[in-house]
A protein has these predicted regions:
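Glycine-rich phosphate/adenylate-binding loop
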Residues: 1, 12-147
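Conserved acidic residues
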Residues: 3-8
Length: 147
C-alpha cells in the first residue's frame, strides 16, 4: 500500500507518522523537514528517496542508510543561507512530474530489488537545457547525522 500523509512533519510527530513504512519518499519544500525525515530514516534504517524541484530544475537521490552510504546531511549538512522554497521560486508542473516519476521509479527499484538505485549519487535535471547528469555523493566522515 502507498500512504500519502497530508500532515506537517515536525520533530514531535515524525516518528509516530513515519516509523511504520518500508520506504520514505520525501517530497517536501523546506530543509527543516528534510533534515527531520533524513534523521528518522537513519535512526529506523528505512530507505529514503529524496527529490527537490525549483522552476525548471530538479534532483533525485536515494539514501539506503547502510553503514557505508551517505545520508542527506552528508550532501546538505545545514540549511543553506538564503534558501528559497517552492513558493518563492515557483514550480513548473512538468518538472514536478519528471522528478516525481523518477522518485517513483527509485522506490520501485528498492521494492523489487531491480537494477541499481541512486544510493550514493544524485541525479540532477536541468529542464531549460534538457540535460541531466548523475554525480557521486561521498559519505561525510564528519556528518552530524550518520557518522
Amino acid at each position: 500500500d502507498c500512504k500519502v500523509i497530508n500532515e506537517r512533519i515536525n520533530k514531535e510527530n515524525a516518528k509516530n507518522i513515519l516509523s511504520d513504512h518500508d520506504i520514505l519518499i520525501d517530497c517536501v519544500d523546506n530543509f527543516e523537514t528534510r533534515f527531520i525525515v533524513n534523521d528518522l530514516a537513519l535512526d529506523l534504517k528505512i530507505p529514503l528517496v529524496s527529490g527537490a524541484i525549483g522552476k525548471f530544475d530538479g534532483q533525485v537521490s536515494t539514501f539506503l542508510n547502510t553503514k557505508d552510504s551517505p545520508c542527506y546531511r552528508c550532501f546538505v549538512p545545514e540549511t543553506p543561507p538564503n534558501a528559497e522554497t517552492c513558493s518563492q521560486l515557483g514550480v513548473i508542473g512538468a518538472t514536478a512530474g519528471i522528478i516525481g516519476s523518477m522518485m517513483a521509479l527509485e522506490a520501485i527499484k528498492i521494492i523489487t530489488q531491480a537494477g541499481n538505485t541512486l544510493n550514493g549519487k544524485i541525479f540532477i535535471f536541468k529542464g531549460l537545457e534538457m540535460i541531466s547528469k548523475t554525480i557521486k555523493l561521498p559519505k561525510d566522515l564528519k556528518c552530524i547525522a550518520c557518522s
